Amino acid sequence: MRADDVDLHVPALCDVEVVAGLRRTVLRQAVSGERAGEAIQDYLDLPISRHGHSQLLTRILGLRPNFSAYDATYVALAERLAAALLTADERLARAVRTNTEIRTLP
């Protein structure tokens, strides 16, 4: 699957999660601060539609038995858009009990 074969949608929360992940890699000295800055720009250049989450809050709370609020945000957005949820998180993929299609990355 290639990014140009599908429309990519993420909750706006994804932006902060990307930065948090890059911050961790810089603190572990796995990448330089300069490279992390380049990675942020690469991420921002991706053709991704970002969605606010305020209209998802009730559903996010409803998913609380199975997901953190962060994971539930992605599940709720996929449900709202009637779109597949693309994830590399096997645990998340196994936990989804809705009619949402799950596609896992290797």
What is the predicted function of each stretch?
Residues 1-28, 52-53:
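PIN/NYN-family metal-dependent endoribonuclease catalytic core
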Residues 10, 51, 69-72, 87:
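Short beta-strand scaffold positions
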Residues 12, 35-65:
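Acidic catalytic patch
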Residues 17-21, 39-42, 59, 77:
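A general alpha-helix detector
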